[in-house]
Amino acid sequence: MSELKDCPLQFHDFKSVDHMKVCPRYTAVLARSEDDGIGIEELDTLQLELETLLSSASRRLRVLEAETQILTDWQDKKGDRRILKLARDHELGAPPKHGKPKKQKLEGKTGHGPGPGPGRPKSKNVQPKIQEYEFTDDPIDVPRIPKNDAPNRFWASVEPYCADITSEEVRTLEELLKPPEDEAEHYKIPPLGKHYSQRWAQEDLLEEQKDGARAAAVADKKKGLIGPLTELDTKDVDALLKKSEAQHEQPEDGCPFGALTQRLLQALVEENIISPMEDSPIPDMSGKESGADGASTSPRNQNKPFSVPHTKSLESRIKEELIAQGLLESEDRPAEDSEDEVLAELRKRQAELKALSAHNRTKKHDLLRLAKEEVSRQELRQRVRMADNEVMDAFRKIMAARQKKRTPTKKEKDQAWKTLKERESILKLLDG
């Protein structure tokens, strides 16, 4: 019983925090359902209330740690009555007595740790123990509000968009208005090649011809006879044959010209301009002239078809020229072009690209014009700031003169009026 009476523990009464009064927002959030959630405007209040609860819990934790330390020290120095007396005095609030300590004998058992010597003063060991118990009157720590750096970050991100326009930015806009060098490449339509089935068939045919010519050459070498055709390239022979067939190919009516060329000639040449053969006199031919002309107009020559070279190229050139002059519509194209889905899609995308490029160019011109106007306005605003400084200087001079109880001079008044008029004129230019 005596040991329990001498126990230095203070047995603090921990008062719980009233959540309804101290933390109303925290209590309301706990009472909600999970679907309601927490609003953004409630975060600051919740943070302050949670910090209040944290400070209360940390204060109770410090008190419990102090009680544990007191119990440990009391167990280690159970025989020291001086320490127990000072602890009881501290509980009652009595100030410790400073003076020469009395000598005491050790009363502890052998099992405990050694205490201080019998004739040794204990004032040095007493003072730290008294400081350990001074925690009841500590004020509640006010939670420190964290620094809110969000506005600074926001204005730092917005600043480049609100800054003044520089000459380098105007120069960049002027360079963007220059047309790119490869702009014409995007509107070119590549020529339509052969269909893959025709190309593959022709390649297979040429490959077979080469194999046949190679086999024939090997056979002729074995026989010792090399034909004249094996020395020629089969590919060149095919090209020459196709060219000759194309040149000598005649339509059914025997006219080498195309339909467009015939229509053009019919539109330009009048009818019945040549007299009939019956009305024209037939001159008498004699001698060599008659022989030569007769040879030229022999029945054999009349049966020979009339041939004109390059009729196909003439037809295509006439068609292109008529389309360029506006006499022929460009829709009169072969049906294969209108049925080509790739070509139609390519032209559609080229039209979209052309419209988008024109729109971007217009917007760039507008942006360049606005940038130049803003640069001139920036110069006017700079002049306004300089005029404001001059007006403030004149105002300070006049106020200093009034404080000294003297009338401002005529020079100071004239200077003030002059700066005010200059400022008004600059503001009119800026508003205009």
From Swiss-Prot:
<feature type="modified residue" description="Phosphoserine">
    <location>
        <position position="280"/>
    </location>
</feature>
<dbReference type="GO" id="GO:0000122">
    <property type="term" value="P:negative regulation of transcription by RNA polymerase II"/>
</dbReference>
<dbReference type="GO" id="GO:0045995">
    <property type="term" value="P:regulation of embryonic development"/>
</dbReference>
<keyword id="KW-0597">Phosphoprotein</keyword>
<feature type="coiled-coil region">
    <location>
        <begin position="40"/>
        <end position="69"/>
    </location>
</feature>
<feature type="cross-link" description="Glycyl lysine isopeptide (Lys-Gly) (interchain with G-Cter in SUMO2)">
    <location>
        <position position="129"/>
    </location>
</feature>
<comment type="function">
    <text>Functions as a component of the PCAF complex. The PCAF complex is capable of efficiently acetylating histones in a nucleosomal context. The PCAF complex could be considered as the human version of the yeast SAGA complex. Also known as a coactivator for p53/TP53-dependent transcriptional activation. Component of the ATAC complex, a complex with histone acetyltransferase activity on histones H3 and H4.</text>
</comment>
<dbReference type="GO" id="GO:0000278">
    <property type="term" value="P:mitotic cell cycle"/>
</dbReference>
<dbReference type="InterPro" id="IPR019340">
    <property type="entry name" value="Histone_AcTrfase_su3"/>
</dbReference>
<dbReference type="GO" id="GO:0000124">
    <property type="term" value="C:SAGA complex"/>
</dbReference>
<dbReference type="GO" id="GO:0010628">
    <property type="term" value="P:positive regulation of gene expression"/>
</dbReference>
<feature type="region of interest" description="Disordered">
    <location>
        <begin position="87"/>
        <end position="127"/>
    </location>
</feature>
<keyword id="KW-0804">Transcription</keyword>
<feature type="region of interest" description="Disordered">
    <location>
        <begin position="272"/>
        <end position="319"/>
    </location>
</feature>
<dbReference type="GO" id="GO:0019904">
    <property type="term" value="F:protein domain specific binding"/>
</dbReference>
<feature type="modified residue" description="Phosphoserine">
    <location>
        <position position="298"/>
    </location>
</feature>
<keyword id="KW-0805">Transcription regulation</keyword>
<dbReference type="GO" id="GO:0033276">
    <property type="term" value="C:transcription factor TFTC complex"/>
</dbReference>
<dbReference type="GO" id="GO:0006355">
    <property type="term" value="P:regulation of DNA-templated transcription"/>
</dbReference>
<keyword id="KW-0832">Ubl conjugation</keyword>
<dbReference type="GO" id="GO:0005634">
    <property type="term" value="C:nucleus"/>
</dbReference>
<dbReference type="GO" id="GO:0140672">
    <property type="term" value="C:ATAC complex"/>
</dbReference>
<feature type="compositionally biased region" description="Polar residues">
    <location>
        <begin position="295"/>
        <end position="305"/>
    </location>
</feature>
<dbReference type="GO" id="GO:0051726">
    <property type="term" value="P:regulation of cell cycle"/>
</dbReference>
<dbReference type="GO" id="GO:0006357">
    <property type="term" value="P:regulation of transcription by RNA polymerase II"/>
</dbReference>
<feature type="coiled-coil region">
    <location>
        <begin position="367"/>
        <end position="407"/>
    </location>
</feature>
<feature type="cross-link" description="Glycyl lysine isopeptide (Lys-Gly) (interchain with G-Cter in SUMO2)">
    <location>
        <position position="21"/>
    </location>
</feature>
<comment type="subunit">
    <text>The PCAF complex is composed of a number of TBP-associated factors (TAFS), such as TAF5, TAF5L, TAF6, TAF6L, TAF9, TAF10 and TAF12, PCAF, and also PCAF-associated factors (PAFs), such as TADA2L/ADA2, TADA3L/ADA3 and SPT3. Interacts directly with TADA2L and PCAF and also with the high-risk HPV oncoprotein E6. Component of the STAGA transcription coactivator-HAT complex, at least composed of SUPT3H, GCN5L2, TAF5L, TAF6L, SUPT7L, TADA3L, TAD1L, TAF10, TAF12, TRRAP and TAF9. Component of the TFTC-HAT complex.</text>
</comment>
<keyword id="KW-0539">Nucleus</keyword>
<dbReference type="Pfam" id="PF10198">
    <property type="entry name" value="Ada3"/>
</dbReference>
<feature type="modified residue" description="N6-acetyllysine">
    <location>
        <position position="418"/>
    </location>
</feature>
<dbReference type="GO" id="GO:0031647">
    <property type="term" value="P:regulation of protein stability"/>
</dbReference>
<dbReference type="GO" id="GO:0051302">
    <property type="term" value="P:regulation of cell division"/>
</dbReference>
<keyword id="KW-0007">Acetylation</keyword>
<dbReference type="GO" id="GO:0072686">
    <property type="term" value="C:mitotic spindle"/>
</dbReference>
<dbReference type="GO" id="GO:0006325">
    <property type="term" value="P:chromatin organization"/>
</dbReference>
<keyword id="KW-1017">Isopeptide bond</keyword>
<dbReference type="GO" id="GO:0003713">
    <property type="term" value="F:transcription coactivator activity"/>
</dbReference>
<comment type="similarity">
    <text>Belongs to the NGG1 family.</text>
</comment>
<keyword id="KW-0175">Coiled coil</keyword>
<protein>
    <recommendedName>
        <fullName>Transcriptional adapter 3</fullName>
    </recommendedName>
</protein>
<dbReference type="GO" id="GO:0016922">
    <property type="term" value="F:nuclear receptor binding"/>
</dbReference>
